[in-house]
């Protein structure tokens, strides 16, 4: 048995749109009987389009960068949380006029500071005051800095990792930062699935386009990214490809 793991945004889809090539590749993977996992910073409600729109069978959803894992039957098999006090403190520290901040429960995404652009379809987002959802199980903070340069966003990411190192880990993905509970990463999520399904590292394939994908590259014997990815990401993978479909057809199913 093989395990193919793909990042979602910027890798498998762009704004929930999948190319015909990638859809064909995923369908071939489904038909082969090999396992498919999607590893993303998104919550569950933002991933249902994979089945509803494209008819894809996903064996494992590794959500919130490893904070929540759901199997093909919709059963939660792994879940970690961030305390409300930590969430509130981080938001106070890093919010700015340029930021949009949302928090995730694993099933619902709440925008608690700023507003997303109206011309982008952000499925499943709700707008809510943080105080009103303090009793929810919060598992990820998503920080978006659309007008900041990469160096500035990286500086914010380092600040979070230094100040809150005992509680969380922050990963930068272009102008986004995902903050998850300590011990959570896409790599931990992939490792959990490997152990649960008794799959060897050499039979594990992982593809992504950003720094939060690097931990899962380390859990895969076969790792992939794109020529358009940042150099720091490209140096961590075994293969450079043009698409998810290419990684599936030329490597996983070869």
Residue ranges and their predicted role:
Residues 1, 33, 58, 98, ...:
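Short, well-ordered alpha-helix to beta-strand connector turns
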Residues 219-254:
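Asp-based, Mg2+/Mn2+-dependent phosphohydrolase catalytic module
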